[in-house]
């Protein structure tokens, strides 16, 4: 089993990611919307809040998607679909994708 981690820093690609997951038959996934902490702490301090406009608020938002995938082929298909869509998957300012092998508790029962 493979754990798939996706950090989407450009939320404009959310639908592309979800469609690619579905097309590659990766269904058991969780999506969490959050805040990128790179600059959030500085911008949220009352002293600095006036220096930043609302236009940059959206760049703090990130989407985290986690999934357990049964076959590497599904992840390869997911990556292929993203490349075909024109998404620059190597640009970590847009998206970061990580995978690692995991074991389930049922493997020990």
Give the positions of each predicted feature.
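Positively charged, small/polar-rich N-terminal and surface patches that mediate targeting and assembly
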Residues: 1-109
């Amino acid at each position: 089993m493979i754990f798939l981690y996706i950090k989407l820093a450009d939320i404009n690609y959310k639908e592309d990611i979800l469609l690619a997951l579905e097309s590659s038959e990766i269904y058991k996934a969780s999506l969490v919307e959050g805040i990128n902490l790179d600059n959030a702490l500085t911008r949220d301090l009352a002293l600095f809040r006036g220096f930043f406009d609302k236009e940059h608020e959206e760049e703090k938002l990130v989407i985290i998607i986690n999934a357990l995938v049964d076959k590497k082929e599904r992840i390869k298909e997911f990556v292929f679909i993203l490349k075909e869509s024109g998404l620059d998957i190597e640009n970590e300012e847009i998206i970061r994708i990580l995978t690692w092998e995991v074991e389930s508790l049922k493997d020990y029962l």
